[in-house]
Amino acid sequence: ARALALNPKFIVCDEPVSALDVSIQAQILNLLMDLQDELGITYMFITHNMSVVRHISHNICVMYLGQLVETSPTKELFSKPLHPYTKALLSAIPSTDIHHKKERIILKGELVSPIDPKPGCRFATRCPYACEACSQPQELREVLPGHYVSCCRVEELENL
């Protein structure tokens, strides 16, 4: 509420509902969305809860160890994730559909030190598709309209 006193156009929300009961989370998220419509506020939502992300966002940026790996409109990211980390992340969301069993992607490999990361893709040590090129810095590239991915193999992995 204090953040709204100055009529901001941009608010950073860092895990704003993580410690709240699910029913309270929904009320807070709905209030934030109403305020966004009424006041034209833009939010940067930082969270690990992909259900919250899906509910409140228009666009999503996925980061791995501080490195942006994918950004896309929300609906497209959930229906067609392209980066291997995003695919693994979304596979971890529990499904409520008992007729559609979702295959969970289990990540293996060693975590890169966030204190002293190597150049290149920070996900490479855990990525099942890593190749030599992954040791080089990866630029975000637009692979679909408005959908950017930081992966040198995205075109060939898109069909997997």
Tell where the protein language model's regions lie, with residue ranges.
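Conserved catalytic motifs of ABC-family nucleotide-binding domains
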Residues: N7
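Charged, flexible cofactor/metal-binding loops and thiol motifs
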Residues: P73-L160
